[in-house]
């Protein structure tokens, strides 16, 4: 493996010259690391190759260990990140160029720059691991633990800094694997820490640095996920309710034009009132107008439907509390409460729902209905429906499992089911739709609750509390998904504690490695 970083002549010149290999000698290692990053992306939906996530990280660990200098270590991690994110979030180009009318070169440059920023995090993880573990005679198992902790901290930083972008967190690749059993215990960050540690063990085993007991422990941790997955951390409450999830398949390029607005208003009014159900859910901004501008005949049709059938309706629309105070909201009407239920989106999308300081010029390059919205409260009451309590979240809010967990544990009466309303038409018929469904499946696993997904173009689905998909509609089709859904009560260990145990354990491992390094240096 060292040949990837140095020439044969450098090897014969001895260890000292090998450490002085210039950055140009990474010409083989960096592309290989980028290829491993692409392999990492392939582990995610629509594939179910959870094992590839571990293998690709093990390959990265092997490359990193052979890098002669710490700066080379960081470059290898960075190349891995570029391959990972360019292959995993390329669909952002579609929203900016196809629907935002941004010049192709500028949209491509924006995706490249964003991926370059995200790639700093695996570079940090690789550098931190080797900074603490290199040359300290750590056992293979101890080194693997430090790798897992470094990867955990870097992923947590990516998911929190600058409002966070935790898309493609490695833990999501394991919704169909044995490590899914750990999600109700430690959440997605705990899962990715376990996966990275297993990758470190695999790397150590390949290099014959792993004691057989440590290898056996790794196999046991992996295998234990299956029986953990069978544990019911939450319990059924009340009777199942009949839900209808609407998928209007309204083209994004006309959705906010007058013809598209008229089409959406007529379409969703018809779909909502077609037949009774205890709960009907529309996608995000299904009614692409302000609630205050809702035509009276549509409001009357929905109210009449609710009053005559006993159904409840949760629908998406924007709201204006004043001329400068807008929210992206979900509204509910039903027989189980007075007035209109309202949920305001709390975690807003940068550039889509708020514009970071200094970036108005960038937004002006796109022909999109973007602006600054006000964020909702972090904890909002669920919507009561036929003995159940439904907690909405809007668009990519379901990427933030800690926020959903906090809303459940801090609520007076926690929700018994979750509902994600979204519009991913911005990203075309791409892997983004399957990736987002996989994220919702992880939220169901973490919370022990069903997740209802009503989307404009897909993937509209019902997810069981164990993360499996109960039913779904084909993407980019017009349709209604009807299912009976059982609400769940009780709090999983992850909901009770959030990310604190996993993150705390990772920080402790890094501090222990740092203390050992300082003691060794003092000696």
UniProtKB/Swiss-Prot annotation:
Pathway: Protein modification; lipoprotein biosynthesis (N-acyl transfer). It is found in: Cell inner membrane. Its main location: membrane. The active site is at residues 284, 345, 395. Its EC number is 2.3.1.269. It is an enzyme of class 2 (transferase). It is a multi-pass membrane protein. GO terms for biological process: lipoprotein biosynthetic process. The keyword Nucleotide-binding does not apply. One of its GO terms (molecular function) is N-acyltransferase activity. It holds the Pfam family CN_hydrolase. One of its GO terms (cellular component) is plasma membrane. The keyword Lyase does not apply. Residues 246-487 form the CN hydrolase domain. Keywords: Acyltransferase, Cell inner membrane, Cell membrane, Membrane, Transferase, Transmembrane, Transmembrane helix. The chain crosses the membrane at residues 26-46, 49-66, 74-94, 109-129, 137-157, 185-205, 212-232, 494-514. NCBIfam families: lnt (TIGR00546). Catalyzes the phospholipid dependent N-acylation of the N-terminal cysteine of apolipoprotein, the last step in lipoprotein maturation. Belongs to the CN hydrolase family. Apolipoprotein N-acyltransferase subfamily. This is Apolipoprotein N-acyltransferase. It comes from Ralstonia nicotianae (strain ATCC BAA-1114 / GMI1000). The gene is lnt.
